[in-house]
Amino acid sequence: MSTSRRIRRRGDALVVAFTALFCLGIGDAKGGPSISWPTQSWHQGTPASVGLDEKTLASLDADFVAGKYGLVDSFQVFRCGEEVFDRKYPHDYAGIYGKEAKSRGPLNARLTGPYNYFDPASHPYYLGTDLHSMQSVSKTVTSAIFGIAVMRGDFKATLNTPVLKYFDVAKVKNVDHRKRRMTLKDVLTMTTGLAWNEDVPYDDPRSDSSLMEATDDWVQYVIDKPMATDPGTTFNYSSGATELLAYIFQKETGQDIEAYGEEHLFAPLGIKHHWKRTYLGVVDTEGGLYLTGADLAKIGYLYLHDGMWDGRRIVSKEWVKQSLTPFVDTGWQGLKYGFKWWLYPRKDGRRFVWMGIGFGGQRLMVFPEEQLIATFTGWDILKDPAIDAELANRLLPAVVVARCQGDAHK
């Protein structure tokens, strides 16, 4: 299956259409409301108070309510430190996926536990809370935690460090000169060179991601894969690559990546979370994080401010810059990839919309020039919702004041 099929499986048709409005360009209105910090909670505002057109957002909301774009659970918009649009769309997932929840398959290789994706106890919300599965947006957050450890000196290895440094090579299969050259940077940019098939849907028995999740030892499954290309040369989306980071983080720092993230990222930003673990207790950094849409937006807000949060340095400006650098072309519709961030090119080809994207309809979208953040959650895990190309034109008038006061991205 092509890269485009894989991205569509994550609900990115909606992402691309929504970002298209900003690829068309925004007017030159000056000034705007000042920014604030949402550590305890987002200040509540209105679209008009931050220079957005409410009718444009309400039109999209109406289509979500009507089911035009599939099983969307939430749609939230943030600007200038305020939450200005918040809509939830309840669904009876126990009824929708009841049959699938009882039949073993690639998305529920184990009928009980957190890796039955049809089980309403843990999907899409965690145990009746408002914490929603982030799926592969977890990768974007993992990258942030990794960068924090680098900045603080707790992760001392350079990005050119070979991945096999952290393994007993005698116990790793398919070792060759290419696998020996695979580096941490290759893992961060999805250019490991490993033979990995995530081009098929996750309910396809050939999916390496689903096959990995059916095993006890995810890390061993990944590192044992043969090489297909030279590392650092070819983008190949691999959830397994990000799972390696949880293992490598513990080996390098001696600390659990979730506990480290709680202390140095989640607590300072006021983020509550749940994080699934593999059957061997390794943090599921490839897709196991649960957040609210409002707390997910804080990650975008942190990156909008170059890693600063209310006067405190959380992650280095250099890591933010590297994370949002287009290191590799994904091979689909101009999308580039940084350190676990998807980068969608704007009209001028030099600037990007920053995105975290997850299976089922999870997405974090950041528009730096406009200081605008949008989050979406959903649980459309069996079908690929379509979207009208005209959606971009419907949303273009939403930004009527170009920037917030105090905008670092003028």
Show which residues each predicted segment covers.
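N-terminal leader/targeting segments and the immediately adjacent pre-domain N-terminus
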Residues: 19-126, 150-156, 216, 394-410
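Short, charged, amphipathic alpha-helices and their helix-cap/turn boundaries
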Residues: 87, 97-122, 160-164, 203-230, ...
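Active-site helix/loop module of the DD-peptidase/beta-lactamase fold
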Residues: 122-124, 128, 151-194, 224-226, ...
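Active-site Gly/Thr loop motif
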Residues: 272-273, 320-375
